[in-house]
A protein has these predicted regions:
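Bacterial N-terminal signal peptides that target proteins for export
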Residues: 1-8
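C-terminal motif of bacterial Sec signal peptides marking the signal peptidase cleavage site
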Residues: 14-16
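Sequence context surrounding c-type heme c attachment/ligation sites in exported
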Residues: 18-165
């Protein structure tokens, strides 16, 4: 009898934990703004070309990872984007959205694997190219699920930004 009670209590405890694990700690907008976007910016910002004015003169710069630490940061950003794509497929984020939500999130997982591979190979051209594909995946999702559309789980103020920022 004692074993049955212990087993029953353990089963109930595990079931209760399972439900809590599916509930995200952030709205999708918060998750995007606080986690996904900054991580994507790290990847996108790793390889780029800039033309700026310095003392009225144009200065052109190729921005690219130079050290092993730089490349590790790019690779880590790519890996995190893949993890975030997986997270977006969890019921707490996917519930109430269409099947295309799952496809977009899975596309983020897949393109992030390519991004991670490009960074691991320290291939500047490939990092730049795959960055465009990451952008396309993000844009396709945002075209269907606009950030300010009142997606289930959004709260007023989730997307407010500082006008001076």
């Amino acid at each position: 009898m004692k074993r049955t009670l212990i087993a029953g209590a353990a089963t109930m405890l595990l079931a209760a934990c399972g439900g809590a694990a599916d509930a995200p700690g952030k709205t999708v907008q918060q998750f995007m703004a606080e986690d996904v976007q900054p991580t994507a910016d790290i990847y996108w910002g790793a390889v780029r070309f800039e033309s700026v004015l310095v003392d009225g003169q144009p200065v052109e710069r190729d921005i690219r990872p130079e050290t092993d630490e730089d490349w590790a940061r790019v690779r880590e950003a790519a890996a995190k984007l893949g993890e975030y794509g997986t997270e977006l497929q969890r019921p707490g984020y996917a519930e109430g959205r269409g099947e295309d939500w799952m496809e977009f999130a899975q596309s983020l997982v897949e393109v992030s694997a390519l991004a991670e591979q490009a960074a691991a190979q320290k291939d500047i051209d490939k990092v730049f190219e795959v960055g465009g594909t990451v952008y396309s995946v993000c844009k396709a999702c945002h075209d269907v699920y606009p950030p300010a559309s009142g997606i289930p789980g959004a709260r007023p103020g989730d997307l407010e930004t500082d006008a001076a920022g």
